[in-house]
Amino acid sequence: RDRLRSRGLGDVYKRQHVAEHSKIIVDALNKSGNLPYEVVWKPTMITNEVIRKTFNEANTDENCAGVITWMHTFSPAKSWILGLQEYRKPLLHLHTQFNREIPYDTIDMDFMNENQAAHGDREYGHIFSRLNMERKVVAGYWEDEDVQKQIGSWMRTAVGVVESSHVRVMRVADNMRNVAVTEGDKVEAQIKFGWEVDAYPVNEVVEAVNAVSQADIDTLVEEYYDKYDILLEGRDEKEFREHVAVQAGIELGFERFLDENNYQAVVTHFGDLGGLKQLPGLAMQRLMEKGYGFGAEGDWKTAAMVRVMKIMTQGMKDAKGTSFMEDYTYNLVSGKEGVLEAHMLEVCPTIADGKISIKEQPLSMGNREDPARLVFTSKTGPAIATSLIDLGDRFRLIINDVDCKKTEKPMPKLPVATAFWTPQPNLKVGTEAWILAGGAHHTAFSYDLTAEQMGDWAACMGIEAVYIDKDTTIRQFKNELLWNSVAYRK
């Protein structure tokens, strides 16, 4: 939503100019094709009372994910203090002006007084700094594509911030025994992010799985067989289909339980399967594909992050996918370094490149039937891997730019979905920095979001974010961690 502020321009004519110009800008932004959501024009804000009223309307409007402000001319910033103090959603400060070029032949003091965003935006920016308030600043000309895309990118972050408070995670298992990094303070997570993380006995969900009708299971199995390649690999065809049907029942039962109880993310653990016949594999992959968050071995933080990142990418054209992921093993051959990413079963098929197959293989973890799972290799290109960790006195979001590649050779004996990437700036520095930061072996991974977007999300949440990218050096990174330990200390 666009908000505009006037300092009480000397005459109605000038105020009309300001309103007309802001309408033109809003209309152009909405027609640009570069914004994922609509910008709603609002009248010029002149008084303290109007500013407070408008910001509080934005607070209570469930369809409003944030506010965009622009100072057409000088705007005394004291008038903004109360409104900003009461405002609770993301804010973007667009530093632009209506005219692209100085009208050299006709410019006079009237024009200067009416078109001084260079003045007004500095005054406005100062009060944010004085109030120590987080905001995004985008500078440039409003008709330029790069500026419009920056606004569009921020919109997705704003949606992620606002929708975070609606994320509810269902845990059907506790944390894996003796594992540290997947632990965390769920109360602090609800304070910081708005996440509700609730536990259910696994057999309560098993009841929902067992209640799924055979007809519904058969229908979903037919969908699987139509959509995916079936790789029997010598297994009995009838038994194979029966195992696939178990996953269909798990998918339908879990989804109904999640929806009936208003959860958007789920956590499982192979050590606590109760009456489930198989470790949920294909079922969890399909739920992630539908937009649910997922975390394995009790990892509720990553489950919530996957959900948030899937919300942020909703409706994105040519999206390449977002998934739960785990670091497994390295290729350390010089010039071909990288990390093989996978999980026992649960990798989201939105990141798949090419055909997707169903396989069944024995799995020692869980001590259940051989589970059906989707198997594929992932897309190439730039992506990000993120890890949210609990340091005891604060959360830290670690964000790594990675370059996804194809493995040098196929891996015919590996019966799981995989990705392969090289962390920036390279495997050596990238992994050293990740370990120094305390990053987990689980990540929320996306081709469709940027480090900037996730850093902006963290800033809005008031938590530390550290970046590992092409410019990272270990000396600089260790200093940053040291400074942050002071800056973010409670």
Set out the residue ranges of the language-model regions.
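Single conserved hydrophobic/aromatic residue that forms the stacking wall/gate
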Residues: D2-L9, Y13
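Active-site loops and adjacent core secondary-structure elements that bind or stabilize anionic groups
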Residues: V12, V221-E260
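Cap/lid and interdomain-hinge subdomains that line or gate substrate/regulatory clefts
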Residues: P36-V39, H95, R100-R235
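Short, well-structured alpha-helical segments in soluble
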Residues: I51-C64, I81-G83, E251-E260
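Periplasmic-binding protein-like
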Residues: C64-H72, L92-L94, Y263-T268
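C-terminal catalytic subdomain
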Residues: G291-P415
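Extended hydrophobic packing segments that form well-structured cores
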Residues: N367-K490
